[in-house]
Amino acid sequence: MNPKLGLTRNVLKRNYALITPDGYVPSVFPGWKNCTPIVLISAALGAGLSQYLISLDTNSTGTGQTEGDEWFLYVVTGKLKVNGTMLTAGGFAFLPPQTKYEIRGAAKVSSLLVFRKTYEPLAGHKTPEFFTGNERDVAETPFLGDKHARLKTLIPDSPAADMAVNIFTYDPGATLPFVETHVMEHGMLFLSGGGAYRLDADWHPVTAGDAIWIAPYCPQWFIAAGPEPARYIYYKNVNRLPR
């Protein structure tokens, strides 16, 4: 696509949005210094989550409090510290509601993905606590028995958890087994590879760096294409009775 000719792969529809790097416009976040935040998904779309992609260097800092929200942080590239804990590429951290955070860049170039939503308490269950990890330590499992489509689950599944964050890896030619149509909302970022994504009744080529918002009940399906596996990280809301 040639942006000088007014061409772009960015698409905004009622039930989904495809946000590609050629259309990124930086924002300014209170408490964040010497960094470049991009708001990929927010309530302005009608979404129930926010998704940010933040570029940092060794002079970058971000401080604040989660208040009533929960944050999931994933290091796409580089390394950084979250409340004193060093996270390298593939590292992640979960920040519960009412948590103070201090984030410091620790490499010349780092990229941080953030999923954020309002936490929904569940009677009889404690709010999940702060934790960190790295996706290299998380085992892959075949998705519905397909060894060519594999999931890594980054947030332990428990009744208290109201969000899931997973990494999906597809070998070339692998697909979702059917067109999914469900109540869960998705926010996602392609980490590597690419393919074709069906969103509602439309088809879109997708590649590393692309972000997608998928509203509840929007039909979706994906096929990986190209010489390397396709990988994306995605959010969905879970474990609560829909209204």
Regions found by a protein language model. Give the residues of each.
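Conserved hydrophobic/aromatic beta-strand scaffold that supports enzyme active sites
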Residues: 39, 51-55, 72-74, 92-94, ...
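Extended, compositionally biased flexible segments
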Residues: 61-96, 103
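Short, conserved beta-strand element in jelly-roll/cupin
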Residues: 55-56, 66-81, 167-171, 180-197
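Asparagine-centered strand-capping/turn motif at beta-strand->loop junctions
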Residues: 103-105, 222-225
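A short, N-terminal "cap"/entry segment at the start of jelly-roll beta-barrel domains
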Residues: 1-47, 108-162
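A short hydrophobic beta-strand segment most commonly corresponding to one strand
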Residues: 53, 94, 106-123, 162, ...
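Short acidic-glycine-tyrosine-enriched beta hairpin
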Residues: 82-100, 200-216
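Conserved short histidine dyad/triad with adjacent acidic residue
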Residues: 20-21, 33-40, 50-67, 153-154, ...
